[in-house]
Amino acid sequence: SLSFYKPILYKREKQKKHYGNDSRIIGWQLDNEPAVQFDYNPKAELAFRDFLREKYHHDIKALNDAWGTAFWSEVYSSFDEITLPKTAQMFMNHHQILDYRRFAASQTNDFLNEQCLLIKKYAKNQWVTTNYIPNYEEGHIGGSPALDFQSYTRYMVYGDNEGIGRRGYRVGNPLRIAFANDFFRPIQGTYGVMELQPGQVNWGSINPQPLPGAVRLWMWSVFAGG
C-alpha cells in the first residue's frame, strides 16, 4: 500500500544510518519474497492513472487504441475516467488488467529501488539483494536495477509432488533448481539463493524429511548452475 511507503523508508533510513558502516555486515536482503500485491484504495487508483498518463504520453486516444475500447463502447475521454479493474457484470477489459498488473509490478520495483538507493547512501561497501520466489509468470522479477544481484528462494520437498526417482519424495525434482538458475542468471549474471530448505517446514500439509545429504545436493546444483 502506498500509505506505508514513506513510513517504511523513514525507518529504513534510521536503520541504515546506524548499521551502514558496521564492518560485521556484508550486505542486505530487502524484505522477504517480495511479490506483486494488488491495491484497490483511492490512492492506488490515482497512481494507476499517473502510470497510464506516462505510459501513453498523456494521449488518451493512444490508450483507447491500445485497449481496444471501441469494442463494447468503453472509449475514455480522459484519464480521470479510468478506474482500477475490480469487477464487471460480464468481463473486464484484458488490456486494462494487463496494464494494471504492470503498474502493480512497477510499484514493487520502485519500492525495492528506493530502499536499495537509501542503503547505498549510507552503506558504500555492502551489497543489496532480495529473495524472489521463482514464479515465472510474475512481471516484477528483475525490474529493480539498483540491486547488486538477484536472489531466489527454493523449497524442494513439502509434499506437493513426488519428485523424481524412488526417493524423489524426499529429494525433490532437480528441475526446480535448474529452471530457477536459468531464469535468474541472465538478469544480471550473478545471482544468489538466500533461502534454501534446510529441513522439514512448518507450513506443509504433508511434511517429508529431506534425505541425509539432500541439502548438500541442492547446494551443489545451485553452484553448478553458474
Enumerate the language-model features and the residues they cover.
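Surface-exposed charge patches
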Residues: L117, D182, W220
